[in-house]
């Protein structure tokens, strides 16, 4: 799906008063389970898991490929990766159609506050079409999550936070919260919270479980 196609692909939640844009996940069953058929843009999404390398990156590859595709008619924007726990394996990303020249790796100095500050700045800068960030459960409280949700809405940015599964116990203003786990040869996606939708469970197959991190080096 081309940039103009998915950018115009909108939905209205049951309680929504404005149209919301989405970007298709690239996986039919998951698109069917999400309002409008994709990841919500201009919103905060939380991806919860017990660990890394269980399909979290493979699940994002189609969307990342679409977001990083060059379009001469549009200004260049970045997809920022903040504090990834691994060094992404460039050949795997390219194999999935991701333009690695549009990826920006950011490694803040140690400390949860520095990391959260970097995330918010990346979203508010207006130069990022997407922000992927890895944070600990204890580092992000309701206040900062609301700030990120608001910043995402203002900038129309696709913001994803990767958090440990125990963050599920915390309240969150995120438009979408999902929990990932392994299910035989698939990645199980449990939709915990979905604005304009309802909880669901979808098994997604068809990509390597450890995706672009399969040959990554730990940091």
Question: What do the predicted segments below correspond to?
Answer:
Residues 51-52, 80, 113-117, 157-158, ...:
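Localized chelating/binding microdomains
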Residues 26, 56, 89, 115, ...:
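Helical mechanochemical/support elements of P-loop NTPase systems and associated helical scaffolds
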Residues 159-219:
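Phosphate-binding/switch region of NTP-binding enzymes
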Residues 75-129, 134:
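Conserved inter-motif catalytic segment of the P-loop NTP-binding fold
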Residues 108-178:
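P-loop NTPase motor core
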């Amino acid at each position: 799906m081309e940039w103009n196609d998915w950018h115009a692909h909108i939905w209205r939640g049951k309680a929504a008063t404005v149209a919301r844009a989405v970007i298709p996940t690239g996986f039919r069953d998951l698109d069917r389970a999400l309002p409008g058929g994709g990841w919500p843009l201009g919103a905060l999404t939380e991806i919860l898991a017990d660990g890394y390398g269980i399909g979290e990156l493979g699940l994002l590859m189609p969307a990342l490929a679409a977001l990083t595709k060059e379009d001469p008619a549009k200004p260049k924007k970045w997809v920022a990766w903040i504090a990834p726990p691994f060094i992404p394996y460039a050949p795997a990303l390219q194999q999935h159609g991701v333009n690695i020249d549009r990826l920006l790796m950011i490694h803040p100095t140690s400390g949860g506050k520095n990391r959260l500050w970097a995330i918010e700045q990346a979203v508010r800068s207006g130069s990022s079409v997407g922000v992927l960030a890895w944070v600990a459960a204890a580092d992000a409280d309701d206040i900062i999550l609301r700030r990120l949700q608001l910043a995402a809405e203002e900038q129309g940015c696709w913001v994803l936070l990767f958090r440990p599964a125990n963050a599920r116990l915390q309240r969150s203003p995120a438009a979408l919260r999902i929990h990932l786990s392994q299910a035989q040869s698939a990645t199980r996606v449990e939709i915990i919270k979905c604005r304009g939708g309802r909880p669901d469970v979808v098994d997604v197959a068809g990509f390597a479980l450890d995706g672009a991190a399969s040959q990554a080096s730990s940091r």
